[in-house]
């Protein structure tokens, strides 16, 4: 298969190198276009008021891989690849392997998920891969599963245009409990802004924080209650696969709001 791979951790990240090399080694046609530096939590931002530059990168990836480092956002990278760098569209757009989870409401901030979302917006099935640890450097189990999943999709394509958000627990392959199709949960954080002063006396802030709670999604979303939540599945050492779309319409609210009146005079 022809694969486009991006990320938000940057060109030097071990996760994207492990993923791209694993897929190239089994014969896939792999192209990498990703940020030239760390771009985590940039969401779906695009660069509009300055030029975007991309340079070919050698000696980082498998010899069969063509790679570019781009000074834009993850979404910039995918858009640039699809419209300017590639000769023809890929069969799949992949993003990751991210260093850290992309679960629940985190996906709204995620550059990893947004890169894959950009592929889906352009009509290409896409997958975001994340290792649910900021510490573990063992991306091999995640890359192994990615290879299995891509091979499966080559034989049996995704039935509808969608994004698969895949989170892999940070354990050895033998310790993975299995794979679960999941629904998006909620992750809430205690946000802390660390206030500091620079040498010129100007105030600046560092955003820090930690997970406060992992809770059920709000009621009324019309989600199947018999499907497990992503954050719970990963806690139990399952690989979580959540199908996503870019349409954010709150469908059940349309009926709830249908009796509203909007007098214009």
Curated annotation (Swiss-Prot):
Belongs to the SurE nucleotidase family. Keywords: Cytoplasm, Hydrolase, Metal-binding, Nucleotide-binding. Signal peptide: none annotated. Gene3D superfamilies: Survival protein SurE-like phosphatase/nucleotidase. Its cofactor is a divalent metal cation. GO terms for molecular function: 3'-nucleotidase activity; 5'-nucleotidase activity; exopolyphosphatase activity; metal ion binding; nucleotide binding. It is found in: Cytoplasm. Its main location: cytoplasm. Its EC number is 3.1.3.5. Binds 1 divalent metal cation per subunit. This is 5'-nucleotidase SurE. It catalyses: a ribonucleoside 5'-phosphate + H2O = a ribonucleoside + phosphate. NCBIfam families: PRK00346.1-4 (NF001490), PRK00346.2-2 (NF001492), surE (TIGR00087). A divalent metal cation binds at residues 8-9, 40, 98. One of its GO terms (cellular component) is cytoplasm. It comes from the Bacteria.
């Amino acid at each position: 298969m022809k694969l486009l791979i991006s990320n938000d951790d940057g060109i030097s990240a071990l996760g994207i190198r492990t993923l791209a090399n694993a897929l190239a080694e089994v014969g896939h046609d792999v192209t990498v276009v990703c940020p030239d530096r760390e771009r985590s939590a940039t969401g779906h931002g695009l660069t509009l008021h300055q030029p975007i530059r991309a340079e070919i990168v050698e000696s980082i990836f498998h010899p069969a891989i063509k790679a570019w480092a781009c000074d834009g956002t993850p979404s910039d990278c995918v858009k640039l690849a699809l419209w300017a760098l590639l000769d023809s569209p890929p069969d799949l757009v992949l993003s990751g392997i991210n260093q850290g989870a992309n679960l629940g409401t985190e996906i709204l901030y995620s550059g990893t998920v947004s890169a894959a979302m950009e592929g889906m917006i352009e009509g290409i099935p896409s997958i975001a891969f994340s290792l649910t640890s900021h510490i573990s450097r063992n991306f091999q189990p995640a890359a192994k599963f990615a290879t299995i999943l891509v091979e499966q999709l080559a034989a049996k394509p995704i039935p509808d245009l969608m994004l698969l958000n895949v989170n892999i627990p940070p354990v050895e392959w033998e310790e993975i409990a299995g794979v679960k199709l999941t629904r998006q949960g909620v992750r809430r954080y205690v946000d802390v802004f660390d206030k500091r002063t620079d040498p010129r006396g100007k105030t600046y802030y560092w955003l820090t924080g930690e997970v406060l709670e992992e809770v059920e999604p709000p009621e009324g979303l019309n989600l199947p209650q018999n499907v497990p939540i992503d954050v719970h599945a990963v806690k139990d050492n399952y690989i979580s696969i959540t199908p996503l779309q870019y349409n954010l319409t709150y469908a059940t609210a349309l009926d709830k709001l249908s009796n509203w009146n909007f007098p214009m005079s």
